[in-house]
Regions:
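Short glycine-centered segments of the SAM/dcSAM-binding site in methyltransferase folds
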Residues: 39, 130-131
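Class I SAM-dependent methyltransferase SAM/SAH-binding core
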Residues: 41, 47-94
């Protein structure tokens, strides 16, 4: 099974139980230091879990990408008519022209199998002085526990922050 199919099959129920982490998402947006007028890229946005928290930070524009058509369909319904958001069903690695002040991956980093390529692409897409944020709504052990039955071609799990950060040196 490929990653697009995996997430398309789960899109309809992806948000079940997600309201309990709203405060966590707000804290992530705050700690990301998103300032009014900045441009933000929400990578692997899924059904738009971070949208409200990002909107509250008052950026000038939010581009949200995901390669699952069904995830993007659900996300689009959440921001229908809101010109702040531009949603695209595409792969991060297809992006070439745009640049951003903040790039965030929320609850999706384990699904990027080639982390070294993520490092390269983020470096291309970040404006000077920009920030890249990888965040999750749960601890590493819980996330890895949730992924024990996920096919290995869909997730790599999370290493410790120290181990993951070696790619970014």
């Amino acid at each position: 099974m490929d990653i697009r199919t995996y997430f398309n099959q789960r899109a309809a129920h992806w948000d079940d139980g997600e309201q309990s982490v709203d405060q966590i998402r707000r804290m992530i947006a705050f700690l990301s230091d998103i300032q009014e007028g900045m441009s933000v890229l929400d990578v692997a946005c899924g059904t738009g879990a971070m949208f409200e928290a990002l909107r509250e930070r008052k950026p000038s524009h939010i581009t949200a990408v995901d390669l699952s058509e069904k995830m993007i369909e659900i996300a689009a319904r959440k921001v229908e008519g809101d010109s702040l958001f531009e949603l695209q069903c595409r792969d991060l690695f297809e992006m070439t022209q745009e640049t951003f002040d903040r790039i965030i991956i929320y609850n999706a980093y384990p699904h990027f199998m080639e982390k070294d390529k993520v490092v390269q692409k983020v470096a291309e897409l970040l404006n000077p002085g920009g920030r890249f944020i990888v965040a999750h709504g749960a601890c590493r052990e819980k996330i890895n526990g949730c992924h024990t039955n996920v096919p290995k071609e869909i997730t790599s799990g999370l290493l410790s922050a120290k181990e993951e950060s070696r790619l970014w040196e």
